[in-house]
């Protein structure tokens, strides 16, 4: 997709973005109503007056600028003439200079005797001439300085905003390519038109943030840490309209169907969460260690009708936790099989009754064990059992919606604060304010420059990326540390398109790539994020060996040597061949998937 196409698509609103045509029909009806109103002569007169007023305003502003330029040129000519006169006077003797001084004194004395009527008619003294010239110079300098500051602020504002160029090219055929005064006047004229005929979506793009463009960022750079104290956060809801977002999501979805909800107290139960958020659509609540202590349930709500038969356990690891995809949380009343539910308990000496079994011979309560309840021998019904502890959330949950439209409805009802998006959860006890953190799909990719090609040999893998971190923020960190960043991507899962905790960074400079791989770790320190991430070479699924180019049985390269002596990908035969020498025997490989 071309650059202009992406920028054009980024200007579309949500309804046009989904392509349902409702927004277009509303706009057509609005345009028809406006056309009927314009047929009225009174409205035409008002519009003519507005257009005349606008033309007069721009004409007057243009005349003022021309007048300032003419006054500046005249001032230069006067200064040159005064310099020539001074040089000529310095070349003569002292008598002419004395004569001029005497004449000036005589004029000043005569001016003191002049009446007020004569002064009103236009006679001016030497002092008044000097004061007028100084006042004109001061006012001219102030106006010129303000004019220069005006253009300088606009030039700083235009940096990194290609949507401004595209918008003005769409409105006008002839426009300059550089940020000169004519371009800025054209932009100001467009902005005035949009103020007279408002368009909320275009006005969102053309927001004037001149004050923020002059703000300086305090950066502290070290070898393994980046601290940015004044990083400008993009808008959470209108990320596509921000200056940091040039990527357009190709597809109908805008948000991930998986939403993070934080700030939940222990008194809020799963039923309370389901009862409140079910108004937005069908969903399921999930959190880590909800099922069998550690296995995450990321099943799709659309698969709730499927019956999954678990395979027989093959080892003690499969007894401890079922295989991936075995549990479907959307199946009501799902109970794990007996061999899976009790295999680990029997192997570790526990019995399903709740107490210690064979290992201790029932010496510690064979029937009730450690149960603090009624002592009935059923661990699932007791208050202190492990199954009850697993069912309580950890202060946060994930909402797994069936449709993406539900997430957009949820975000629309949230209120925004400095920390993020919040909503008031109506529980059985009292209303609770909880944080809603949706994932915008456009945040998963960020391009620094469209014109720079991506070299696949200069791509680094970033492990341990915090899930709230966006691609633009990750690009900002690496740009401040190493520089020459071309593209940054956040890895997302295929089912919910939610971040997986890793990312990719593509460099345009070999030295920057080598420095990043050599450092191996970097600490991301920004606001509430403080985490050390790992930097490794990126392994593609068909990564070829750089030593033999896949000649050995067409094997891929699962090894990478980070030593500067090698610093390339190897297949297994080439690794043993190249590192058999004693000088390279101590090299430690970076293995794919480890």
UniProtKB/Swiss-Prot annotation:
Keyword RNA-binding: yes
One MF annotation (Gene Ontology) recorded for this entry: mRNA 3'-UTR binding
GO biological process: negative regulation of cytoplasmic translation
A single Gene Ontology CC term: nucleus
Skewed-composition ranges (Basic and acidic residues): 72-90
Domain RRM: residue ranges: 458-540
InterPro entries tied to this protein: CEBP_ZZ, CEBP_ZZ_sf, CPEB, Nucleotide-bd_a/b_plait_sf, RBD_domain_sf, RRM_dom
Residue span of region Disordered: 72-91, 367-388
PROSITE patterns: RRM (PS50102)
Keyword field: RNA-binding
Skewed-composition ranges (Gly residues): 367-378
Keyword RNA-binding: yes
Function per UniProt: Cytoplasmic polyadenylation element binding protein that binds to and regulates the translation of specific mRNAs.
The protein's name in its UniProt record: Cytoplasmic polyadenylation element-binding protein 2
Protein's gene: cpb-2
